[in-house]
UniProtKB/Swiss-Prot annotation:
One of its GO terms (cellular component) is epsilon DNA polymerase complex. This is DNA polymerase epsilon subunit C. Transmembrane segments: none annotated. It comes from Saccharomyces cerevisiae (strain ATCC 204508 / S288c). Residues 102-165, 178-201 are annotated as: Disordered. DNA polymerase epsilon is a heterotetramer consisting of POL2, DPB2, DPB3 and DPB4. The gene is DPB3. Its main location: nucleus. Residues 117-144 have a biased composition (Acidic residues).
């Protein structure tokens, strides 16, 4: 029984046909029998398209025995047969997608070759690079003590500057406070003098 069902069932899975049908904005609730009939119709349509494309490919093959169905042969069939003319937009979209895939493949290949070139170039001049590194090391060893001494001198100068700045700021604050204190004392002495004057008479 199961073998009979498999033989009578469509090649396209009914669940996938149902999913594709639900993508249509004008989809209406459809029975399983109608969906299986649609699957059979799609199977017959694809079979007819492939047969027509193969016939045109054989006519253009110029005596080749082995044929391969390509997108170009399907495109030719769509252009020459009126009953497949509605597929022109789909064929254009397929061609765009295949062109993008080819560009991606081409972009991937030059990147690999460029990386290999970058790796190979330093290997050609290994001796020159070693000599240059040795010269740079000698020069840097001679210059390092000078830089260290300069850094030490700079750090000492900065510490001296900081200490003089801090002392100067403390003194200025102290002088400012002392000036305020002097002003307060002078006011208080005036008051005391006034008190003595008031007590004398």
């Amino acid at each position: 029984m199961s073998n009979l069902v498999k033989e009578k069932a469509p090649v396209f899975p009914i669940s996938k046909v149902k999913k594709i049908a639900k993508c249509d904005p004008e989809y209406v609730i459809t029975s399983n029998v109608a969906i299986s009939a649609t699957a059979f119709a799609a199977e017959l349509f694809v079979q007819n398209l492939v047969e027509e494309s193969l016939v045109l490919a054989q006519l253009n093959s110029k005596g080749k025995t082995s044929l391969r169905l390509s997108l170009n042969s399907i495109e030719e069939c769509v252009e020459k047969r009126d009953n497949f003319r509605f597929l022109e937009d789909a064929i254009k979209q397929l061609k765009k997608n295949s062109a993008l895939d080819k560009k991606r493949e081409l972009n991937m290949q030059p990147g690999r070759s460029d990386q290999e070139v970058v790796i190979e170039e330093p290997e050609l001049h290994e001796d020159d690079g070693v000599e240059e590194e040795e010269e740079e090391d000698e020069v840097s060893e001679e210059e390092e003590p000078v830089h260290n001494e300069e850094l030490l001198d700079d750090s000492k100068d900065q510490q001296n500057d900081k200490s003089t700045r801090s002392v100067a700021s403390l003194l200025s604050r102290f002088q400012y406070k002392s000036a305020l204190d002097v002003g307060e004392h002078s006011d208080s002495s005036d008051i005391e003098v006034d008190h003595t004057k008031s007590t004398d008479p």
